[in-house]
C-alpha cells in the first residue's frame, strides 16, 4: 500500500519532532520532510509534492493562513491546520477552514498515557481523512490501536417507565472532514423558526465555540456550543463541545442535551453514534437524522437505529461530500431513507418537519 506522504510545517523544532514521531508510529503514513516556515516548505515542494501538509497557524516570516491561501489558489493540496488552544488560535483556525483547510488538530502536548494515545489516534486519523479529501481551487483571499467502542459505553440502560408522548420534531446531524463548510451551507438554509437542531462535528476541544460563534453570526437561526442541560428549542442549533460526548434526552415533552465525558466511541469524542442512538431512544419517529461528509463509520450504526425507530434519515450524496466515508457506511448498513446532495438537505428536512 502506498504510504501517505506528509510535510510538517511548524516554527517549533519540538512540535516538528513530536509530530514526526506521532506520524511515524502509523504504518500508513510517511513523514516526507519537516520545515520551519512556509518559505522552506515551498522550496521543498519544488522537488517532492506531499499528499498532506500539516501547517502551523502562527509562524514568523509568513503566517499559516497566507501560505494556505497560496497553496489552495495555485496547486491545492490537503492541509491540516495545527493550532494551539487559544481564542486567537481558534478564530484563525476557523478562517483556515473557510480558505480550504480540511481538518483542524490541536498541537500535541504532554499528558497522561491515555491522553497521548488519544491524541496520536486523532492526529493520524486527521491525516488519513485529509488524504482522501476532494479539493477545489480557492481564489486567494505496529502500534496499539484505540479500541473501537460502541455507544453502549456512554448510553445508560433505558428507563422502564413509559415517557410522555410528544410530536415535536428534532433534527440531529453528524459530520467530520469537510463538515464545517457543509454545516454552513445546511444551517444558512433554515428560517429563524426552524425545528431544533443538535449537531456533532468532529473538532478538537476549544475550537467548537469559535465555530458556533462564526455560524451564529451568519445564520438566521441561533447557533451555540452546547452546555449540559441546554434545552433543545426551535430556532436554535446546538453544537457538541470538542472532547465531550453529547446525548439527546427528554423529560416529559422537553428535549434537552446531556454533555458527558467517556472513552472514544467509534474513535471519536464527541461521537455521532452516541448522539444518533440517544435520538433513536428518546425521539424515535419524531427525529430526523442527517449524516454528512467525513471519513470512517461514526454514526452509521446509530443512523440504522434511528431508521429502525421510525425516524427520517438522510445521507449526503457522494458528489457533494469532501470525503464519502460516514454517509457511505450508513447507506451500506441500511440506515438511510434518502441520499441527497448537500444543497437539498435543509429543504427536505423543513418539508418533513412541517
From Swiss-Prot:
GO terms for biological process: chemotaxis. Residues 164-354 form the CheB-type methylesterase domain. Its main location: cytoplasm. InterPro entries: CheB-like, CheB_C, CheY-like_superfamily, Sig_transdc_resp-reg_Me-estase, Sig_transdc_resp-reg_receiver. It catalyses: [protein]-L-glutamate 5-O-methyl ester + H2O = L-glutamyl-[protein] + methanol + H(+); L-glutaminyl-[protein] + H2O = L-glutamyl-[protein] + NH4(+). It is found in: Cytoplasm. Residues 5-122 form the Response regulatory domain. It comes from the Bacteria. Phosphorylated by CheA. Phosphorylation of the N-terminal regulatory domain activates the methylesterase activity. Keywords: Chemotaxis, Cytoplasm, Hydrolase, Phosphoprotein. One of its GO terms (cellular component) is cytoplasm. One of its GO terms (molecular function) is phosphorelay response regulator activity. The active site is at 176, 202, 298. Its EC number is 3.1.1.61, 3.5.1.44. Pfam families: CheB_methylest (PF01339), Response_reg (PF00072). The modification 4-aspartylphosphate is found at residue 56. Gene3D superfamilies: 3.40.50.2300, Methylesterase CheB, C-terminal domain (3.40.50.180). Involved in chemotaxis. Part of a chemotaxis signal transduction system that modulates chemotaxis in response to various stimuli. Catalyzes the demethylation of specific methylglutamate residues introduced into the chemoreceptors (methyl-accepting chemotaxis proteins or MCP) by CheR. Also mediates the irreversible deamidation of specific glutamine residues to glutamic acid. Contains a C-terminal catalytic domain, and an N-terminal region which modulates catalytic activity. Belongs to the CheB family. This is Protein-glutamate methylesterase/protein-glutamine glutaminase 2. It comes from Geobacter sulfurreducens (strain ATCC 51573 / DSM 12127 / PCA).
